[in-house]
Amino acid sequence: MSAFDPGQPQHLGIEEEYLLTDLQSRCMVAEPPPEVLRDCREALGQNFAYEMFQGQIEVASPVFDHSAQAGAYLRQVRSALDQALASHGLGFICAGSHPLADWHEQRATPQAHFRQLFNEFALAARRSVLSGLHVHAQVPAAVDRIAVMNEVLPWTPLLLALSLSSPFWQGHDSGYLSYRQVACDEWPRMGIPEYLHDHQAFDDYLRLLRGIGALGAEDNAWWGIRPALRYPTLELRMTDACPRVADAQTLAGLFAVMVRHACLLPAAGSQYTQAQRWLLKENRVQARRRGAQGRYLMSPDQAPMNLGQWLELAEQVFGDTAQALGEEPLFERARQLLRGGCSAERQLSCHAAQPAESDREARCRAVVDLLLWESRDSEPESTNAPP
């Protein structure tokens, strides 16, 4: 099945979304002045992109050969963005949700594409004040991307569990570690992909939905992993945005390694069954609710695993591919992430550590401060605590 030459790098790209934040109130900015967005565009250059809400922007990276390049680029981007916003009394957070954002107050970006989304999907769209980490990994033209997707799909809740960063919603503890993934289920064609055997079935699926008017001619499904339409890639969309660049780099690298591994298999995706899809859906539920405390199954015949055991299994399966790509440190970095706690756990710990007399908003402001600090960190190895 492989169409890779020996030694060929695994190309990848990243899209990150940032929530603009007032440094005084710690609230998400609803309507940033035009000069703020102008300065953001100048800071990020051609990779700047608008998002659904005026107080949210996106960066779409160039193509990289290695996750280390992606990490260096994101640090550069975040540093430039932080400098551009500072003169306006603003900062940004890169997380699945903003602890103090109120979706009622947010304003849609006045562009035709976004207006269509808000008109068509109403409350589901207006409530989607959420940010994800999207990773593109190249798949050779000769390789069926749905077969690769089916091979990688069972592992996506593991990546989600390492990315969790949206425990707060509307100023309250949601009870989930990724409330973003809960909110995503309000949309059609999100979450777990339909059960498809090959790319022809995917093309038939899109053709059917376009034929009945459910999708536009250039539209795609919004699944947590999907074949991209504009690029020869498989795109991971399930993961929450990561406050720390090191975590985003680790997750992007892991996904790229998984895709390369699948591309090298003679029969990728052939073991993906309807029963595995049922387990996949339950693993996603476990990940978004319990994270490291969840219990996970890759096979009906297997004993449940905790997240650490699942990560060990991933290293057994993908370790040789990671080594061949020069990505050996990924699994140790993932273990460090797991030992230190995902972003959602860090946010909840910060919230709980505030003085007993603190009110709900004061506790959430402290969490925003943590996210502001983690998101602006531009150093590859930072051990300093937030002030």
Swiss-Prot record:
Q: Which NCBIfam families match?
A: gshA_cyan_rel (TIGR02050), PRK13515.1 (NF010039)
Under catalytic activity, the entry for this protein gives:
L-cysteine + L-glutamate + ATP = gamma-L-glutamyl-L-cysteine + ADP + phosphate + H(+)
The answer to whether UniProt assigns keyword 4Fe-4S to this entry is no
Q: What is this protein called?
A: Putative glutamate--cysteine ligase 2
EC number(s) from the headed UniProt entry: 6.3.2.2
| Superkingdom of source | Bacteria
- UniProt-recorded Gene Ontology molecular function terms: ATP binding; glutamate-cysteine ligase activity
Q: What are the GO BP annotations of this UniProt entry?
A: modified amino acid biosynthetic process
Q: Which HAMAP family match?
A: Glu_cys_ligase_2 (MF_01609)
Instruction: Tell me yes or no: is Ligase among this UniProt entry's keywords.
Output: yes
As for what it does, the entry says: ATP-dependent carboxylate-amine ligase which exhibits weak glutamate--cysteine ligase activity.
> From what organism does this protein derive?
Pseudomonas fluorescens (strain ATCC BAA-477 / NRRL B-23932 / Pf-5)
Q: Which InterPro entries match?
A: GCL_type2/YbdK_subfam, GCS2, Gln_synth/guanido_kin_cat_dom, YbdK
Which keywords does this Swiss-Prot/TrEMBL entry list? ATP-binding, Ligase, Nucleotide-binding
Similarity remark: Belongs to the glutamate--cysteine ligase type 2 family. YbdK subfamily.
